Amino acid sequence: MRVGPVRFALSGASQPRGPGLLFPAARGTPAKRLLDTDDAGAVAAKCPRLSECSSPPDYLSPPGSPCSPQPPPSTQGTGGSCVSSPGPSRIADYLLLPLAEREHVSRALCIHTGRELRCKEFPIKHYQDKIRPYIQLPSHSNITGIVEVLLGESKAYVFFEKDFGDMHSYVRSRKRLREEEAARLFKQIVSAVAHCHQSAIVLGDLKLRKFVFSTEERTQLRLESLEDTHIIKGEDDALSDKHGCPAYVSPEILNTTGTYSGKAADVWSLGVMLYTLLVGRYPFHDSDPSALFSKIRRGQFCIPEHVSPKARCLIRSLLRREPSERLTAPQILLHPWFEYVLEPGYVDSEIGTSDQIVPEYQEDSDISSFFC
């Protein structure tokens, strides 16, 4: 994956101009610009110039030059401490505007070009683990990549391309999709998941909300939020994690106290996603979590008549109670439904009003407390 440079804040106005500690050149052309800091003296002691370092820092080595961005307006707190007030802040060449609906995520506007990105903030001690999946994955058109990383004293600021809304919100607004559109979008979803699986990464908490539109036309999708994925070793994809969205959880996660196949669980989630795209509601739904999990354990669901036979076949091939009987992500891409629906001359059925729209769930929850 092509990754932009990590830039470390090096100096304030009193420091000499010089290159910062950057990504190795193999990862792209490093940016050699200074960042603002709130304590030039402290930064001078902590941040040696690249020419003073014995060797260039490894991409995932501990940060050698942390310092803070220009802080937002602050007020005096108890004990004389400063408390940041909500609102825009500035770091390097970016104006950060927090998104109310997404914690620790901001719109990032370049003050020179007007380019808009998304900025995620991570604790400096944990940012390496958070961005590791992005680094491990080879470049893919349906998976988001890192544009730039800026390191502060306490936080890492990771910049991504902006998006144009997520799939969950899109399906809620459309009720359900025609099969031709669903096939085009679902093929991109599966392609991203297959690429992750082939690169030793299991998604774990896979859901529609993790896929966002890359363009305003809403024809191109990309997978984002890889921070909570699982990096596996070899062919062993056994997981024991029970963290995720209840609507997408697979039966084996509910039925076992040990481990389960992470890839097979991802495929089950793909089945839930495809059903939701075509029907406009989840295959298993109940406001009571215990009742919901009982339905998932039984694995019984109804596919409406308007769904084509080939689409029904694919859904059933994904939502099998036995994990070993499910298709793999690469096998899904070979299913005849895609060719059938996407071939010229295909006529879709009329869109009707779904009797139940996709509900809002607590998307990021620990489901282990609901287990019997």
Swiss-Prot record:
MF terms (GO), sorted A to Z: mitogen-activated protein kinase kinase binding; protein kinase inhibitor activity; RNA polymerase II-specific DNA-binding transcription factor binding; transcription regulator inhibitor activity; ubiquitin protein ligase binding; ubiquitin-protein transferase regulator activity
Organism placement in taxonomy: Eukaryota, Metazoa, Chordata, Craniata, Vertebrata
Keywords, ordered alphabetically: Protein kinase inhibitor
Region ranges (Disordered): 1-26, 49-85
Record motif COP1-binding, residues: 355-360
Subunit structure: Monomer. Interacts (via protein kinase domain) with CEBPA. Interacts with COP1.
Pfam families tied to this protein: Pkinase
Swiss-Prot/TrEMBL GO biological process terms: JNK cascade; negative regulation of JNK cascade; negative regulation of lipopolysaccharide-mediated signaling pathway; negative regulation of MAPK cascade; negative regulation of neutrophil differentiation; negative regulation of smooth muscle cell migration; negative regulation of smooth muscle cell proliferation; negative regulation of transcription by RNA polymerase II
Residues covered by the Protein kinase domain: 91-338
GO cellular component: cytoplasm; nucleus
Biased composition (Pro residues): 59-74
Gene3D superfamilies to which the protein is assigned, alphabetical: Phosphorylase Kinase, domain 1, Transferase(Phosphotransferase) domain 1
Keyword Nucleotide-binding in annotation: no
UniProt cross-references to SMART domains, sorted A to Z: S_TKc (SM00220)
Protein name: Tribbles homolog 1
Protein source organism: Mus musculus (Mouse)
Recorded domain comment: The COP1-binding motif (355-360) is required for regulation activity. The C-terminus (351-372) is required for interaction with COP1.
